[in-house]
């Protein structure tokens, strides 16, 4: 039976690379994001792709997107909760409340709303079950300077992952988290020229091909439901994570 996955933040970067990997593997792929043009570019003309324009922070928009996919497919096997955003590096006292609220809305509330929609589908479908994969970050373990909004949401994603794992047991819903470090995307490109470090210096950082992330998500998704990659860290080995700070 052909499997299906919904990928949020699928218009570019990690999401687009992951969509490409799953389409090539024969999955039906729902590409979720706010920009229809970037979603269409990522989907190409692949017959198994479905563009789902959606604001992940809006409950009605999320329900509509997941409902559209279910109407077409009748089943959802995997959710990759990937949508997220950062903010300019500032200390807590320099961070305005609108920036804080927007990062929380996308990174945390959006992940919860999409997980909630997927959980309901996976719980009610037959055969029951499915898999939710949350994009954490190495920032779920160690912060960068001036990253209070982003780091806080990524720590919270770990709590969401654990809660979904526990609540999903009786319904064969597995949940895992992939913590990614310096995959080369548009957002990470500036790291090649210089990023603030914990000692106050600005230094370039090592990066890795985003395809390694896509392949890792695929590995997690392909596990049988009696096995689960609970947490995985995929990172550029020379980036300042181990020993950061």
Regions found by a protein language model. Name each.
Residues 177-178, 196-242:
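C-terminal helical subdomain
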Residues 90-92, 96-104:
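Substrate-binding pocket helix/loop in short-chain dehydrogenase/reductase
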Residues 11-13:
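Conserved glycine-rich cofactor-binding loop
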């Amino acid at each position: 039976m052909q499997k299906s996955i919904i990928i949020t933040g699928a218009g570019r970067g990690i999401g687009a690379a992951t969509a490409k990997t799953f389409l090539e593997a024969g999955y039906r792929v729902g590409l979720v994001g706010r920009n229809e043009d970037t979603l269409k570019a990522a989907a190409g003309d692949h017959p198994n792709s479905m563009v789902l324009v959606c604001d992940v922070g809006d409950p009605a928009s999320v329900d509509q997107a997941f409902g559209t996919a279910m109407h077409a497919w009748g089943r959802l096997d995997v959710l990759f909760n990937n949508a997220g955003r950062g903010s300019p590096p500032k200390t807590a006292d320099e961070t305005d409340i609108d920036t804080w609220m927007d990062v929380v809305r996308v990174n945390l509330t959006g992940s919860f709303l999409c997980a909630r929609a997927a959980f309901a589908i996976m719980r009610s479908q037959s055969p029951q079950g499915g898999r939710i994969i949350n994009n954490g970050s190495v920032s779920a373990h160690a912060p960068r300077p001036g990253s209070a909004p982003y780091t806080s949401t990524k720590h919270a994603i770990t709590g969401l992952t654990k809660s979904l794992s526990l609540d999903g047991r009786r319904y064969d819903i597995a949940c895992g988290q992939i913590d990614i470090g310096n995959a080369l995307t548009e957002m990470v490109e500036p790291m090649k020229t210089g990023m603030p470090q914990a000692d106050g210096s600005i230094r370039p950082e090592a990066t890795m091909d985003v395809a390694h992330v896509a392949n890792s998500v695929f590995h997690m998704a392909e596990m049988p439901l009696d096995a689960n990659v609970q947490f995985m860290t995929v990172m550029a080995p020379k980036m300042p994570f181990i020993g950061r700070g």
